[in-house]
Regions:
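Short beta-edge strand/loop motif at the mouth of beta-sheet-based domains
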Residues: 8, 14, 21, 33-68, ...
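Short, flexible helix/strand-to-coil boundary loops that buttress conserved ligand/catalytic motifs
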Residues: 30, 40, 82
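Glycine/alanine-rich phosphate-binding loops at beta-alpha junctions
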Residues: 26
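A detector for short, charged/polar N-terminal pre-domain segments
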Residues: 1-6
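A conserved amphipathic terminal alpha-helix motif
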Residues: 115-162, 166
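A structural signal for short, well-ordered beta-strand segments
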Residues: 13-19, 107-109
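Beta-strand/loop substructures that line and gate deep hydrophobic ligand-binding cavities in soluble
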Residues: 71, 79-127
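Solvent-exposed alpha-helix faces
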Residues: 31-32, 134
């Protein structure tokens, strides 16, 4: 998923996945702390405009991603903005109902930058979402409303990143 750039210097990456469930069920899995913690990383999410979202990428709190919810439109859309390497980074989540009991979940990271210094980092986000969205689809297909634990497994691979992620 290439980085999109506009003339003003705004950049974005996005990823999406089709998952089973109603918009309300999918919203519960992406826009609540207990829901997102089942398939992403341990998280707290205060569901309201002005609320706080915290995603814990390390158990000791050293890699917490803290953001303020600036848009809250359940069960369709929310935006959280936080400080990132290049400055403010906005992450927009949307849920779109489709036929056949499916919904499309889309996440878009947007940031402003005057150089491409952070482009590789954010390009990596889009690849990471591919793997996490596979987990979301598995969770909603086979384990909805069940509790789980998130963990990370690091394994060296001689394959290109995209090939290794596809095999996960």
């Amino acid at each position: 998923m290439p980085i999109k750039k506009d003339a003003a210097g705004n950049r974005s990456v996005e990823a999406e996945v089709d998952v089973p469930g109603t918009p309300e069920q999918v919203w519960n899995a992406i826009a609540t702390g207990p829901g997102i913690s089942q398939w992403f990383v341990p998280s707290e999410l205060e569901g309201r405009t002005g609320g706080t979202s915290v995603s814990h990428f390390a158990s000791d709190g050293s890699m917490d991603a803290v953001a303020t919810i600036t848009v809250w439109e359940p069960p369709r859309r929310f935006v959280a903005e936080g400080a990132g390497g290049p400055g403010t980074v906005a992450t927009e989540w949307t849920v779109e109902a489709k036929s056949g009991g499916l919904c499309t979940v889309r996440v878009v990271h947007r940031w402003f930058a005057t150089s491409d210094d952070w482009d590789d980092q954010f390009d990596g986000h889009s690849h990471g979402w591919i793997a996490f969205f596979r987990l979301l689809r598995l969770y909603l297909t086979h384990f909805p409303r069940q509790h789980g634990s998130a963990f990370q497994l690091l394994v060296p691979s001689s394959e290109p990143l995209a090939d290794a992620l596809r095999k996960l």
